[in-house]
Amino acid sequence: MGSISSTPSQKSPVFPARSLLPSDIVAVRPEGDEAKVLKFPDLVKSIPFPLRLNPYIRFVSAESDAFIIEYANFSEKQRNRFIGLNAGLLCGMCYAECGPEQLRVCCDFMSFLFNLDDWSDEFDTAGTKGLEEAVMNTLYHPDTYVSDTVAARTARSWWTRMLKTVGPRCRQRFVETLGFYFKAILQQAADRSSKTIPDLETYISLRRDTSGCKTGFALIEYAAGIDLPNEVVDHPIIQSLLDATNDCVSWANDILSYNREQSRGDTHNLVPVIMQTVGIDRQAAIDYAGDLCNKSVAHFLEGKAALPSWGKEVDVQVEQYVQGLEDWIIANAEWSFMTERYFGKDGPKIRKGLQVSLLPVVGFD
């Protein structure tokens, strides 16, 4: 296999926290029964993109679930949680036009990424570092590196299949951005150990990597069978589209997963970061985060309208890439109420009512 170089991550600028604060947010609200209910903004309403679904998803998702269950050696509780996750459905909506082979790789990776997220939540810094070494060595040295860890064996399976058709530049971006993800969750683990809540600007930069979205966006190229030139992906407008998509997905996730995460005492979430940085209560912070989601959609539309031309052939590929980003935005917003990850089986009901009762703090399960 060819070598893969590593380059440092370029951080996108983020705006001062208080400059983003909507003028109508109330800084302090009275405590009482109202404080025990979390009200969500309608995140889907501001997204102008149609929801699409890959026609192969039903059987591909079933095959992928069986593969992960076989490799992961779940307990019964973990198995039920994994099935309720329904990661395959998210893939079917994010990668709506690819063939079954590419969709299977995407499904396997998406389920793998969600498991990494859960495993890293349970690890300290040393455990997370060991996880990183096993996975990244598998990607850098697929022909020679050997590890019996579940993470490495699972990664080797989908990676060897992906290598059959992935373009060299897309491959580079995939590996590089997964490396960014691991570096970021190491920082997240360190913050958890020290009980540190970062300020808003620091968190936004970190969250763009802990989300795993950057690697998911590389899969857009793989799924479409394209390999965009580096100068296209590195263009400021394309980067602005990537950041806007990442922010929209990450912040929607933070809003809708906040109740579950606060019940575990997990503070790597936009809501507590806003509460601390801006000095407002949890409901005001949720409203604030919803406003940021709406702004990220607006920024995406502005960037799309300003795209330059790179010539007919590349422009067609860019159009496919941007379509994939749009699919990611709407798919994540809708899927969040279809999965059992955040609301159990109550997702459809909460999708209509847009509110939940505040859960008690019980710690990590």
From Swiss-Prot:
SUPFAM superfamilies on file: Terpenoid synthases
Residues the entry annotates as binding (2E,6E)-farnesyl diphosphate: 341-342
Chain positions recorded as Mg(2+) 2 binding sites: 117
Motif NSE/DTE motif, residue range(s) on this chain: 253-261
EC identifiers of the protein: 4.2.3.-
Function description: Terpene cyclase that catalyzes the cyclization of farnesyl diphosphate (FPP) to various sesquiterpenes, including beta-elemene gamma-cadinene, delta-cadinene, and alpha-cadinene.
Top-level division of the source organism's lineage: Eukaryota
Keywords, in A-Z order: Lyase, Magnesium, Metal-binding
Record-given protein name: Sesquiterpene synthase 3
Organism: Postia placenta (strain ATCC 44394 / Madison 698-R)
Family: Belongs to the terpene synthase family.
Membrane-spanning segments: none
Annotated site, Plays a critical role in the stabilization of intermediate cation, chain positions: 114
Intervals of motif DDXXD motif: 117-121
Required co-factors: Mg(2+)
InterPro entries the UniProt entry points to: Isoprenoid_synthase_dom_sf (IPR008949), Terpene_cyclase-like_2 (IPR034686)
